[in-house]
């Protein structure tokens, strides 16, 4: 289950999600149609996708925005390209660094077009979030992977080594890095801390101390809510959802190991085979506008990518940023990330 899908259900919103590769939105009788590929939880009632569709169409009445949704992320389009099948979309929204690396390594020609310098507003994106050296992907938000913990049950662990102490035995839930974004980010964070030569030894120690590796974020967070453990790998925006008089805030404390959080920016990119490349770039520019950035942050529960945007409200009050953000760059991951994950899966998950 995707994090945003789970959270929308948990707070009582109507899901209204499309099926795999389904299209949302009906083209008008005239004008242009922009087809945006995105993960399914980007669309539906109350989502960033539906707000963007409505607002963009209001400003561009001759344009219809449709969503092509996928549970398999960019992998579906990598497969289409490798098989010579049509992409049938103009723009992909929701791309992260590892997915871009995968697309570039598996395909002879780029799946995406270079368009970053032609996107109005791209110069306002926080420099630290840029992750495509070829200028194809423009970040539109970011999250920070952290721990969420129950302060009534455990003290905040200060460092990665603290997690190995006896008082944290059987207390940490995480996700499988083979298929989960936060799980992969947490694994990469441990590699960043322990090095490519030391991370597997560290994970062996975590395993000995009872870490539980579950399939995805939703499964892990449900287990945390069921009090199967006192800590879970999650996002530093946890309290945006979980606060108020009817919430035990002690169970939604955010912990930054080593005073850090792992930055996991999301980006958008125009497909190289886009039927409407100029319209795709206009939509990308619209997503970087101050109003859109505030709406995306609030509805995705992620931080804005653009400098100086304050979403305000509950987000402004309860979203926590780490003292230091760490992440791996595109160049760091090329030729490495696949092997790191494969070795981890073979030695840790399979045992």
Regions found by a protein language model. Give the residues of each.
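N-terminal secretory signal peptides and thylakoid transit peptides that target proteins
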Residues: 1-19
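N-terminal Sec signal peptide cleavage junction
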Residues: 22-23
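Early extracytoplasmic/lumenal segment of secretory-pathway proteins
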Residues: 31-101
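Extracytoplasmic ligand-binding site segments that recognize negatively charged/polar headgroups
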Residues: 88-228
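A ligand-binding cleft/hinge motif common to bilobed small-molecule-binding domains
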Residues: 98-102, 231-250, 300
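Periplasmic-binding protein-like
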Residues: 143, 204-206, 213-214, 247-272
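Mature extracytoplasmic/periplasmic domains
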Residues: 271-328
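Extracellular/periplasmic bilobal clamshell ligand-binding domains
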Residues: 313-351
């Amino acid at each position: 289950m995707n994090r945003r899908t789970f959270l929308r259900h948990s707070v009582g919103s109507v899901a209204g999600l499309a099926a795999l590769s389904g299209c949302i939105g009906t083209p008008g009788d005239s004008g242009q149609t922009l087809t945006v590929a995105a993960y399914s939880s980007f669309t539906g009632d109350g989502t960033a996708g539906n707000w963007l569709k409505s607002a963009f169409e209001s400003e561009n009445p001759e344009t219809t925005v449709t969503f092509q949704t996928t549970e398999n992320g960019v992998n579906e389009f990598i497969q289409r390209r490798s098989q010579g099948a049509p992409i049938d979309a103009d723009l992909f929204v929701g791309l992260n660094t590892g997915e871009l690396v995968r697309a570039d390594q598996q395909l002879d020609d780029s799946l995406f077009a270079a368009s970053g310098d032609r996107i109005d507003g791209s110069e306002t994106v926080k420099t630290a979030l840029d992750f495509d050296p070829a200028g194809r992907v423009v970040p539109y938000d970011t999250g920070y992977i952290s721990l969420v913990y129950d302060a009534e049950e455990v003290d905040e662990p200060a460092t990665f080594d603290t997690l190995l102490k006896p008082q944290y035995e059987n207390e940490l839930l995480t996700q499988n890095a083979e298929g989960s974004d936060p799980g992969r980010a947490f694994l990469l964070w441990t590699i960043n801390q322990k090095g490519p030569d030391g991370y597997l030894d560290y994970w062996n120690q975590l395993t000995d101390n009872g870490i539980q590796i579950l399939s995805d974020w939703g499964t892990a967070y449900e287990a945390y809510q069921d009090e199967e453990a006192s800590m879970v790998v999650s996002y530093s925006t946890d309290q945006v959802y979980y606060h108020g008089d009817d919430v035990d805030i002690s169970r939604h404390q955010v912990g930054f190991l080593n005073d850090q959080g792992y930055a996991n920016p999301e980006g958008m990119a125009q497909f190289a085979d886009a039927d409407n490349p100029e319209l795709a770039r206009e939509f990308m520019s619209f997503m970087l506008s101050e109003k859109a950035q505030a709406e995306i942050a609030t509805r995705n529960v992620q931080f804005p990518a653009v400098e100086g945007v304050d979403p305000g409200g509950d987000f402004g009050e309860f979203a926590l940023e780490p003292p230091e953000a760490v992440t791996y760059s595109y160049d760091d991951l090329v030729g490495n990330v696949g092997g790191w994950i494969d070795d981890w899966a073979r030695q840790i998950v399979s045992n």
